[in-house]
Curated annotation (Swiss-Prot):
Classification lineage: Eukaryota, Metazoa, Chordata, Craniata, Vertebrata
UniProt: a divalent metal cation 7 binding residues: C49, C54, C58, C59
The encoding gene: mt
Keyword DNA repair applies: no
Name of the molecule in the record: Metallothionein
One Pfam family per UniProt: Metallothio
Length: 60
């Protein structure tokens, strides 16, 4: 099983090498979510994404 596979309904906690393109997890690390900008220090440690957008607690 691909450790970087992102399911649509579950959680994923991929490591720094994760290159998921279409992560739809409800809880996901920054490395799995393209919605989190690489230059954000708060996102660097991981943020919660909803589909392709970050929640209100990310990068505020």
């Amino acid at each position: 099983m691909d450790p970087c596979e992102c399911s649509k309904t579950g959680n994923c906690t991929c490591g720094g090498s994760c290159t998921c393109k279409n992560c739809s997890c409800t809880s996901c690390k920054k490395s799995c979510c393209s919605c989190c900008p690489s230059g954000c220090s708060k996102c660097a440690s991981g943020c919660v994404c909803k589909g392709k957008t970050c929640d209100t607690s990310c990068c505020q």
